[in-house]
Structures are given as C-alpha cells and as structure tokens.
Curated annotation (Swiss-Prot):
It is found in: Cytoplasmic vesicle, Autophagosome; Cytoplasm; Cell membrane. The lineage of its organism: Eukaryota, Metazoa, Ecdysozoa, Nematoda, Chromadorea. This is Protein lgg-2. PANTHER family: MICROTUBULE-ASSOCIATED PROTEINS 1A/1B LIGHT CHAIN 3-RELATED (PTHR10969). Belongs to the ATG8 family. The gene is lgg-2. Gene3D superfamilies: Phosphatidylinositol 3-kinase Catalytic Subunit, Chain A, domain 1. It comes from the Eukaryota. The keyword Cytoplasm applies. It comes from Caenorhabditis elegans. Disruption phenotype: Viable with no visible defects in development or fertility. Embryos contain an increased number of endosomes. Lysosomes have a reduced capacity to interact with autophagosomes in embryos and furthermore, there is defective autophagosome degradation with an accumulation of lgg-1-positive autophagosomes in 500-cell embryos. Double knockout with rab-7 partially rescues the defective lgg-1- and lgg-2-positive autophagosome degradation defect in the individual rab-7 and lgg-2 single mutants. Pfam families: ATG8 (PF02991). One of its GO terms (cellular component) is plasma membrane. May interact with vps-39. Interacts with lgg-3; the interaction is direct. Interacts with atg-16.1 (via WD domain) and atg-16.2 (via WD 5-6 repeats); the interactions are direct. Interacts with sepa-1 (via the LIR motifs); the interaction is direct. Interacts with sqst-1 (via the LIR motifs); the interaction is direct. Interacts with epg-2 (via the LIR motifs); the interaction is weak. Interacts with atg-7; the interaction is direct. Interacts with atg-3. The interaction with atg-7 and atg-3 may be required for the lipidation of lgg-2. GO terms for molecular function: microtubule binding; phosphatidylethanolamine binding; ubiquitin protein ligase binding. One of its GO terms (biological process) is cellular response to nitrogen starvation.
Amino acid sequence: MSGNRGGSYISGIVPSFKERRPFHERQKDVEEIRSQQPNKVPVIIERFDGERSLPLMDRCKFLVPEHITVAELMSIVRRRLQLHPQQAFFLLVNERSMVSNSMSMSNLYSQERDPDGFVYMVYTSQPAFG
C-alpha cells in the first residue's frame, strides 16, 4: 500500500515526477526538448496530492504549443480527464497559484518555470486549500 513506491493507481498513491526523476535528468530532458522543439513548453501536470474526486491521467509530461492560453490547456486536460462540463476543475501552478486563463503558455513559462526547466501544474476540484 503506502510502501509501494512504484505507484498504485488503485490506492491513488503515485510518486510525483520530481520524486521519480532526479534534477539533472529533468534538466537534461528540458534541454533536449527545447533544442528540438523550441516552440513547445515542457509542462508536468499531476493530480493534487489530496485530490480524490478527479481521476489520474495516463501521463504527466506534456509539450504544449507556446502560443496557446492557459484556458486552452485547461480544455485539453478536461478532455483527457473526461470530465462533465459542470464538474469543478482547477489548474494550479507550482501547487499554489491560479493564473489568468488568458495568459499564453510562453508567458507562463517565462514567469513560472522551475529551475529544472519544466512548468509544474496540479489539477484539483477545489480552488483553495484550508
């Protein structure tokens, strides 16, 4: 159960991308991605740790065109999760902040990227945590 470091989709305990990949490997991944596809933003999207009502996605690493907006990315994630239109869904950057839906991914990347070069986002059904 909780000792299963390989991750369990049944229990919902899945190690984060940062836990699975050391910093230098993540940084190398981004360097390769950006050199091969400079118009794409490398994004990691994972389910918020305490989230239980939204499903897990089949993958967490995405290459997003830099010209699309956060709202367009939310639509893509919503479709991948197969959510109903009325189902609550929020994307938080760096597990803490909501950003403007009209912000482009290139602006988000320049403002919020991690030192390893990825933008980290989590999805949740709750906008704030108390």
